[in-house]
Amino acid sequence: MEITEGQLNQLDQSGFFKMDQVISKKEFQEIRTRMEDITQGRIQYSGMSFQLDGSSKAYDSVPNGGGFQGPSDNYRKIQGWEKDPVFLKYMRHPIFRDLTQKLIGDQVSIYRAMFMNKPPWNGTNLPYHQDGGSGWGLSSYRANQFVTVWTAIDDSQIENGCVQVIPGSHKLGLLSDRGHTITEEQVKEYAPEEKSVYLEAQMGEIFVLHNFLLHKSGINQTNKPRRGFSVCYMDGTITRINNPNHKFPVLSGENAIKITG
């Protein structure tokens, strides 16, 4: 199993491509069970970050994150999944190793591994944004040093707030040096509704995304959760500007973290 030239060409031209589930049904169910174990506090790891969803559905009213805040199905974002052996094994699947080796190189680390959730009848309206820029506080943020792999933990549909993208928008580069959200004027110019594409997926399916691709997501208007698992792989030589000694989890290459348990 390896990434094809056609998939890489699609990533280059459109800024994304879709993949089928890469693990067995049993292994995928283990991931779903482990995710529930962590959100409910049955398994806990020091250093994971938990952010509850807001009540207003507005992005600017989302509460700050922190440590584990008790069993809940209402977590919006949880980071630090590389601490768990089940998720670490998934992140190191040979197909993702092939992807990162072809795009980044031999030394690959994890900028972040996060769970994103839109609870039933809720969820946050996440406006158009790009992943990267000086706001990340990194020693480098060139486009070819990053790639994001997003896995559908549940079916992801228009009704439950699936990701929307503007195909080809990664070729614009960063629309601001800081990155992240864009202005209303930029939305009108670069992301009109008629250009948007909904990335619908069945559970287990995967989207590989260019970090500079404009993307957003809406609220969940169904009675079931819409959960996704997102991993941002990056060049392992990158450090934090304000803390060069900070060690990002190394996924492959020298000093790679080991799977335990």
Which role does the model predict for each range below?
Residues 9, 156-214, 238-240:
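Double-stranded beta-helix
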Residues 45, 49-51, 60-66, 162, ...:
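Non-heme Fe(II)/2-oxoglutarate
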Residues 123-130, 137-139, 159-165, 174-178, ...:
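A short secondary-structure junction signal
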Residues 103, 136-158, 200-201, 232-237:
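Short, conserved beta-strand element in jelly-roll/cupin
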